[in-house]
C-alpha cells in the first residue's frame, strides 16, 4: 500500500473519521461561509457547545478540502509554468528544484483555530468564513516579501519531506500532453539560488556575501525579516494585518466577524491596515477607483510624507464577466501573472476564495486557505514557520475562476511605478474585448466624501467604487459591487 504523501498530510486532521457521521443536514448548516449564530454573536466566553461546534466545523472543513489532495497535481513538462513573474520548464531536475524553492517560499496563510476571541463575538476561529481575508493576507504578504526581503530570496529551512515522485506520465489521449506529477518534493536542496541583491536595510556585508546554498543555515538578519513578515499576519489583536485587525476594519464597511468578505472590500481593508501600521511608513496601498488607476493619485500618495517616495502596492478590484468568467480576458490574466511586478490575484470560485500565483496552459496555480490549523504564537522569538509555507501546489481550470477578483501589483520606486504602468498597459492591450480589464490614466480620480469601503480618516483620497454601469438587478451587496467589463 502506498504511503501517505507529506502534501496530503498537510490537509489531514484527526477528526476526519467524522466524515461518515456527518448528515446531510450537517453539511448544509456547516457549509462554506456558514457560522452558527451562537458562536458569531455575543461577547462572552464561548461555552462548551460552541467549542464543540467550532471543532466539528474545523474537522469537517479539513476533511472536505483534504479531498483535493487525493489526486496528484500533474505538470506539463513541455509547457512553461508561470509563477509570480518567473517562468519554469520542467524538462530537468534543476528547473523542478528551482520551482520548488520559489513556490514553497510563498507565505501560506490559512484558517486558524483557538486564537483569541474576536471583538464583538465569541468566535475563536475563522474557519468557514475567513478565506477571502486569508487570500488577501497572502497577497499583501507577497508584497511585503518584495518590499523587505533580498531579491530572489528563498526560504532555506523548508519542510523535511521524504516522499519523492517525479513520475513522467505518458499521454493518455491527444488532448492530454505528457506531464510531470509533483505531489511532493525532496527535502534535500539540489541547486543553489542566484546571488541575491538585498533590499534597503541589508548591510554592505550581506550585499557582498556569496550566494548561500539553500541547505546552509539561514542568514540571521534575513531570517528575522522573514519572521517579521509572517508575524504581521499573526492571529492576535496586536498584529497589524492579522484577522483581528482586519475584522475591526471591516466594521467600517458594515461587516462583522463571520460574514463573507468580497475581494473589493478586502482590498480596502488592507489599504487601511497598511496606512495605520506605524512600522510600514515607507509603504502605501492604493486601491483603483472604477477599474482605473489614476497616476497622479498614486504619485501623491507615495510622496505624501517626509520619508521620500513610498513603495506602493496597487490593488485593482475588477469583475471579469457577468455570472462567469469572460474567456476573452483569460489572456490578459495570463499576461499580468507573467509580470514580475504582479503579487498575485485574490478571488476564486463562488464563496470559495483562492490566491492565484501563476498558471500553466489553461490552468491556474493557487494557494488554498481552506485548511484549518492550530494558532501559532508569533510573538515567540523562534516560532515555527512550517505551517506558513505550503509544499503542495494545486491547479484549477480558468473556466472555474469566479469573475470577481482583485489584482495585486507592487512598485518599489518611482521608476518602478512608471515601468509598471507601461508593462501592465501592454499586458492589458492583448484583450479582444473593447474595454480593457482596467486602465492607467493621468490626473486624479473623484474624491468621495461619503463613508464606504474606502472610508476612514487615516488616508486620502478615499477610493470607492461607483457602479453606474451595473444593473440594478445585480444581487451582489453594495459594498462588493464591480464595474462589469
Swiss-Prot record:
One of its GO terms (biological process) is protein transport. One of its GO terms (cellular component) is cytoplasm. Keywords: Autophagy, Cytoplasm, Hydrolase, Protease, Protein transport, Thiol protease, Transport. Disruption phenotype: Morpholino knockdown of the protein results in neurodegeneration in the central nervous system (CNS). Neurodegeneration is characterized by severe visible malformations in the developing CNS in regions that correspond to the midbrain-hindbrain boundary, the cerebellum and the hindbrain region. GO terms for molecular function: cysteine-type endopeptidase activity; protein-phosphatidylethanolamide deconjugating activity. The active site is at residues 131, 368, 370. It catalyses: [protein]-C-terminal L-amino acid-glycyl-phosphatidylethanolamide + H2O = [protein]-C-terminal L-amino acid-glycine + a 1,2-diacyl-sn-glycero-3-phosphoethanolamine; [protein]-C-terminal L-amino acid-glycyl-phosphatidylserine + H2O = [protein]-C-terminal L-amino acid-glycine + a 1,2-diacyl-sn-glycero-3-phospho-L-serine. Its EC number is 3.4.22.-. It is found in: Cytoplasm. Residues 22-46 are annotated as: Disordered. It holds the Pfam family Peptidase_C54. Cysteine protease that plays a key role in autophagy by mediating both proteolytic activation and delipidation of ATG8 family proteins. The protease activity is required for proteolytic activation of ATG8 family proteins to reveal a C-terminal glycine. Exposure of the glycine at the C-terminus is essential for ATG8 proteins conjugation to phosphatidylethanolamine (PE) and insertion to membranes, which is necessary for autophagy. In addition to the protease activity, also mediates delipidation of ATG8 family proteins. Belongs to the peptidase C54 family. This is Cysteine protease atg4da. It comes from Danio rerio (Zebrafish). The gene is atg4da.
Amino acid at each position: 500500500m502506498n504511503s501517505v504523501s507529506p502534501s496530503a498530510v498537510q490537509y489531514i486532521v484527526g477528526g476526519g473519521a467524522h466524515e461518515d457521521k456527518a448528515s446531510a443536514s450537517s453539511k448544509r448548516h456547516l457549509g462554506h461561509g456558514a457560522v452558527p449564530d451562537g458562536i458569531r454573536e455575543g461577547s462572552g466566553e464561548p461555552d462548551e457547545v460552541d467549542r464543540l461546534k467550532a471543532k466539528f466545523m474545523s474537522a469537517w472543513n479539513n476533511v472536505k478540502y483534504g479531498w483535493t489532495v487525493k489526486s496528484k497535481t500533474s505538470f506539463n513538462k513541455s509547457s512553461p509554468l508561470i509563477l509570480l513573474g518567473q517562468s519554469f520548464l520542467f524538462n530537468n531536475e534543476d528547473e523542478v528544484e528551482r520551482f520548488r524553492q520559489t513556490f514553497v517560499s510563498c507565505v501560506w496563510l490559512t484558517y486558524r483555530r483557538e486564537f483569541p476571541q474576536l471583538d464583538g463575538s465569541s468566535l475563536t476561529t475563522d474557519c468557514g468564513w475567513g478565506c477571502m481575508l486569508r487570500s488577501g493576507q497572502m497577497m499583501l504578504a507577497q508584497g511585503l516579501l518584495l518590499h523587505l526581503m533580498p531579491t530572489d530570496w528563498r526560504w532555506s529551512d523548508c519542510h523535511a519531506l521524504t516522499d519523492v515522485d517525479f513520475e513522467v506520465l505518458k499521454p493518455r489521449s491527444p488532448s492530454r500532453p505528457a506531464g510531470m506529477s509533483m505531489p511532493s518534493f525532496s527535502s534535500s536542496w539540489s541547486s543553489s539560488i542566484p546571488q541575491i541583491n538585498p533590499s534597503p536595510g541589508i548591510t554592505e556585508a550581506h550585499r557582498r556575501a556569496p550566494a548561500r546554498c539553500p541547505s546552509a543555515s539561514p542568514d540571521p538578519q534575513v531570517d528575522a525579516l522573514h519572521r517579521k513578515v509572517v508575524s504581521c499576519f499573526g492571529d492576535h489583536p496586536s498584529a497589524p494585518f492579522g484577522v483581528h485587525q482586519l475584522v475591526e476594519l471591516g466594521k467600517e464597511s458594515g461587516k462583522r466577524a463571520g460574514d463573507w468578505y468580497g475581494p473589493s472590500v478586502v482590498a480596502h481593508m488592507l489599504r487601511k491596515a497598511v496606512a495605520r501600521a506605524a512600522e510600514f511608513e515607507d509603504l502605501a496601498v492604493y486601491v483603483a477607483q472604477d477599474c482605473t488607476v489614476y497616476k497622479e493619485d498614486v504619485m501623491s500618495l507615495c510622496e505624501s510624507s517626509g520619508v521620500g517616495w513610498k513603495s506602493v502596492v496597487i490593488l485593482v478590484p475588477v469583475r471579469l464577466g457577468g455570472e462567469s468568467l469572460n474567456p476573452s480576458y483569460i489572456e490578459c490574466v495570463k499576461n499580468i501573472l507573467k509580470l514580475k511586478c504582479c503579487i498575485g490575484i485574490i478571488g476564486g470560485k463562488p464563496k470559495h476564495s483562492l490566491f492565484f500565483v501563476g498558471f500553466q496552459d489553461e490552468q491556474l496555480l493557487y494557494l488554498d486557505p481552506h485548511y484549518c490549523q492550530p494558532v501559532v504564537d508569533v510573538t515567540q522569538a523562534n516560532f515555527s514557520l512550517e505551517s506558513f509555507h505550503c509544499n503542495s501546489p494545486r491547479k484549477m481550470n480558468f473556466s472555474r475562476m469566479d469573475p470577481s477578483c482583485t489584482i495585486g501589483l507592487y512598485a518599489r520606486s518611482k521608476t518602478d511605478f512608471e515601468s509598471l504602468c507601461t508593462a501592465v498597459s501592454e499586458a492589458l492591450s492583448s484583450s479582444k474585448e473593447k474595454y480593457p480589464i482596467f486602465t492607467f490614466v493621468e490626473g486624479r480620480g473623484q474624491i468621495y466624501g461619503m463613508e464606504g469601503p474606502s472610508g476612514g480618516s487615516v488616508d486620502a483620497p478615499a477610493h470607492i467604487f461607483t457602479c453606474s454601469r451595473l444593473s440594478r438587478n445585480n444581487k451582489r451587496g453594495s459594498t462588493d459591487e464591480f464595474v462589469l467589463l
